[in-house]
Amino acid sequence: DIIEEFEISHLVRMLSELDTDDITYVLEICEEELRKEVLKNLPKELQKLIKKALTYDEDSAGRIMQTDYVSIPVSWNIGQVVDYLRTSKRVPDEFYALFAVDSRHIPVGTVPLHVAMRKKREVKISDIMTTNPKIVSVNDKREDIGFLFDQYELTSAPVVDARGRLIGMITAVSYTHLRAHETPI
């Protein structure tokens, strides 16, 4: 109810500062009319991402994933990664892992950020990545995602589409936040 008290322009500015999973969460609890008005006023790229997220089943990875993540070609070295992180406008505010992808954008490994930042520039990503990453499908249910995070103590997991291409990520922080809202006190 308090959300509906804000002017649309103010609400759009506030939401634009959030991660896509948080924007989706806020909009799904809004009245339909307000949701449409806010969506219409979001930047076009963000509008597209949120509309897509809202098409996924409410209980699926697609609904709770963040679409801001860092993917890097598996052929890169640490120097290329650092240069990319410094210059790219597409780097999320918070991330814990680099997702190494092949030429088809399929995740083939992960590198925790703290590991990557301690390596010399010439070290190849393929030499330090963990292969066979724990992958979440866009249609996986929340309970399956929870099992994966609990079982493997993940800090983040890549989310893939039906073709296996990387389209998002779920972080342990998002997963924990989600669990807190589902658990009765």
Regions found by a protein language model. Name each.
Residues 180-185:
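A short, hydrophobic C-terminal helix/tail in secreted or cell-surface proteins
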